Amino acid sequence: MAHHPETDLYRCKQCTHAFSHLEAMREFEQYEDNYFDVEHRRWFDHPNTALFARIAKAIPPGASVLDAGCGRGDFLRYLTEHRPDLRLSGIDLSSNQSVDGIRFLQGDIMQTGIHECFDAIVSLTVIEHISDVTGFVQRIHDLINPGGIAIMMTNNEGSLLYSLARAGYHLGVPLAFNRLYSRHHLHHFTRESFRMALRRGGFSIESDFVHAPPLAAIDIPVQGKIADAVLRGGAWILFKVGAVTGRNHLQTIVGRAVALPQFDVGSC
């Protein structure tokens, strides 16, 4: 694939999965205090409540739920209002202020000792930041009760937005390309490679769908209201076309945990 200012990019010819040169990127994958408040302020100021509502409908009544990589806890806060029957927990590298009805844990889900299992685990825009995708999905599988569900969301590298960004790079306009393949995204999943990752980790695919983020949530790295409005209008058109063609920017999978005898040690 093309060269990024911060790393080299590669693509698997079999599963179409794109990924960064992981060793070279390891030093970049650090999250400063301004990750939520400055660098991606719009994304976190405009939560995807339409997606939250769709996910909430997929969670069984009375379920215990873990949000893996919960960030500021926006999804869990949504559930406290709309699904008060659920038992809610969240884990993230960053600390969170206490909220009634939510138990927050601070740490790396791959290393933190969690001595219980859950009926549903949700993980939104996290897997693309994890170097060991297989280990992450298997860790989620280990923390789910038999027959429980995992709901994961990530970018869709097969989307129209990604395609235009790659075309722009080859035409000498790399702004969108450099943004989408940023240093914080180690993996770039197509729909095929995302499904494959969950199947390999012990999940059958219940459903999957593509969708767009809220237009107001897009971080557009330009100065000036006119330039911002033009690019945001272009994104709106892309998202509308993506909805019709099935090539929208985000993808979500609902998977059900199935038995994996080779991974039984330490699982629920």
Question: What is the meaning of each model-derived region?
Answer:
Residues 1-124, 133-137, 210-211, 219-223, ...:
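Conserved N-terminal segment of class I S-adenosyl-L-methionine
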Residues 63, 147-148:
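Surface-exposed loop/turn positions
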Residues 127:
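Conserved SAM-binding site of S-adenosyl-L-methionine-dependent methyltransferases, i.e.
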Residues 144:
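Amphipathic alpha-helical interface segments
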